[in-house]
Amino acid sequence: MCATLCTLLDEISILILMLLLIQLEIRVSAAQGGGSHAAMSPEQYWRSILPDSTPMPISISQLLGDGYPYSPAVGLPKRGDRVQIRYGPNIYGLAASQQFFKDPTMGLFFLETNLQSSKSIKLHFANMMAGTKFLPRGEADAVPFSSKDLQEILARFGVRPGSVDASVVKNTLLECELPANKGEKKACATSLESMVDFVASSLGTRDIKAASTFLVGKDGDTPAQEYTVTGARRMAETGQLIACHPESYPYAVFMCHLTEATRAYKASLVGKDGAAVEAVAVCHTDTAEWNPKHAAFQVLGVKPGTVPVCHFVQPDVVVWTRRG
């Protein structure tokens, strides 16, 4: 028994040493090939590219800091009571039977008129950040990020092949490799710096703003309850916006996509229990190509292409627009 225990301890020690060496290798590669911004922290890069009037949303700032120790337990995404729609070539093509929602009374989708003051919507806002941190760009760029390198990626981050977490990692890589939907641009940002670059390039300006839903003066979740809209304002006059959604991965990765024919709002909400939420809402103004059996149409009782379909975004999503 002692011999077996000693052998197990030796194997664990070797694994820990291998992981430490991998981290050292990544850091050395980053230091040697980081480019002109190699000495900048992600926060400094943000400030160097974006104007001072672009504050960093808490959904991003809480993911800063050293990306190590990373999380080998990437976990399955927990999406609360909202429709589970993954990005893909047919993102709006799922029928209601293919979508997941626990409570049919939840305001997953609503009409744009519901953003008028005094309107009430049943909602559940959950803090669903996975807890994994951003890697600095140099380190992220030194790590393979491709489905063809899956086995190497699993080994680097201590994810057991064949496990549920390995399947999650694989799905994230495959989703990131899917082509953009018609009329959209997309990219998976493996660092904050690459997210900023994609957004500025896609919107054609650095004069942009970023927003996320946040619970005022409160951490964690709020119960599912009725919220009253106390005010709403357009984030921008343009119909373009970029939404960045977190992906399940050993370190922070965001799927960002630019969409046309949309309107973004910032809405002030107050729950029945007094909870205050500053929420971001996105309204899709062209739904003509959506699946007629999509949950939005069944919930709202409307047909594709007739009225804008709106939804609030959860606190882990970042929405970017041009300023003004």
From Swiss-Prot:
Residues 1-30 form the signal peptide. The keyword Lipid biosynthesis does not apply. The keyword Signal applies. It holds the Pfam family BURP. Keywords: Signal. Residues 109-323 form the BURP domain. InterPro entries: BURP, BURP_dom. Expressed in panicles. This is BURP domain-containing protein 5. The gene is BURP5.
